[in-house]
Amino acid sequence: MKNYTIVSLIALSLLTAQTTTVERQAASDIIKKIDQLQSKIQPTQTARKMAAKKDRNRDKILKRVETLWDDQLRDLSDHIGQNPEIGFQEYESVDTLTKVLQSFGFSVTIGQAGLETAFVSEWESPAKGKGPTLGLFAEYDALRGTKEPFHGCQHNGQSPAAFASAVALAEFMEKQKLPGTIKIFGTPAEEMGPPAKVIMFEAGVFDGTDLIVRSHGTDETTRNKPGFGVCCLNINMVKYIFEGRPAHQRSSWNGRNALTAAVQFYTTVDHLRPTFRPEAVIQGVIPEGGVAPNVVPDRAVVDYYIRYPDEVYLAHMDAMIANAARGAALATGTKVTIDRYGEYRDGITVGSLEELAFAYAEKLNAPEINPEPQRPAGYEETGFVTRKIPGVSVSVYSSSAPGHSYERWLDSMKEVGHTGFLLDAKVMAAILYHYLTDDSFKKTVHMEHKTMADLFNNYLDALKDAYKEELGDTSK
């Protein structure tokens, strides 16, 4: 491994999402190449010029976004907010949202990739010729609360904001006879696993989409630096299902206790914690452990979220924990099935899109602007979609309350939330407009995204090499 001074490591940590020493060592050359790329395309300066330029068509689109919001979509946001439904159970929300889309002339297909509350809504320009396919993510799931579901992450505003952008742009395209397709992807259950976007991605639901935009409520107006990262560490969601044999507890030797296996496994994982690097996070519960004290439990389930800043070391942790589960099963005469039901990974951030979104947020006088770029994080929470399709998540201030709080939920139905969601819609519409009408910008976006994707693969190879002494050859 290369040697780095403390100063250089601190500097790198401020610029990137790479938080561990190994990550920073692996990423050092990659970061230089990212900086060279950004110097070449000048995303900040270019975005400010694009936003400042007089453009009657763009201004008409943004005005139409505002009219759509004021006339109908603000009330739709409040309606979804007042009727929260948790992930994979958003039936009424989907019914309401898709009926609104149909009223605007968008086709709707409910049920995607085996998910009943996922949908795709599509509008195709009547103009002849091949145009881009523009995508928007729409979320609508609520959080699980101790008393009731609630929209503490303000997902109630995301779909209406996306609708305002999409409809305004569709009307412009039809009037100007511009070819292209607009797709709104209804993605359920952002707040719980298994991650719906990964399921939809692997099923090919997003295939053929050229660009995806989305928005999300936040406590400041900001943007991310270009690079690789994820909001909440790389995650493996894993269930360990132990199966034994029931028996009366007075003759427990006739059974095989699945709960004993689960508890032994859970305890072993606790003993493993000091053997992992300090950045490792392991969070687990035992949601199933038998149904009656007088019956030997023949089924028990341990559910873990295994987290680490990079996916290479995460795979090592996953393998060690899986071995602990197999050992517990072997020791207790039970069987274990390992169900890896969800993954979240580093995503790719595209500077040209992030800076354009931020330039428009500034132009539109968004509140609580943080001028400092934040650490890279993919525009959607799983990371997988960002590696294939360029996109951006618009972040405009919509509440000062903590995330996942009842106060933020209430703010989503007040002026502070309404203002933030409307600005989200305008910024998304502006980004889509430029991508549709500016070939130079479109080429820059795809060139940057492809370059970043290649650099990300180089980064993963560098990580494997950096861990080789500690973990052995992880490429096998």
Region locations from a protein language model:
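Sec/Tat-exported extracytoplasmic proteins
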Residues: 65, 69, 77, 81-84, ...
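Acidic/His- and Gly-rich active-site-bordering loop/insert found
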Residues: 24-27, 31-152, 156-180
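Sec-dependent signal peptide recognition
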Residues: 2-9
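Metal-dependent amide/peptide-bond hydrolase catalytic core
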Residues: 49, 260-263, 267-476
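Histidine/acidic-residue-rich, glycine-tolerant segments that coordinate divalent metal ions
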Residues: 120, 142-157, 173-297
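Hydrophobic h-region of N-terminal signal peptides that target proteins for export
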Residues: 10-17
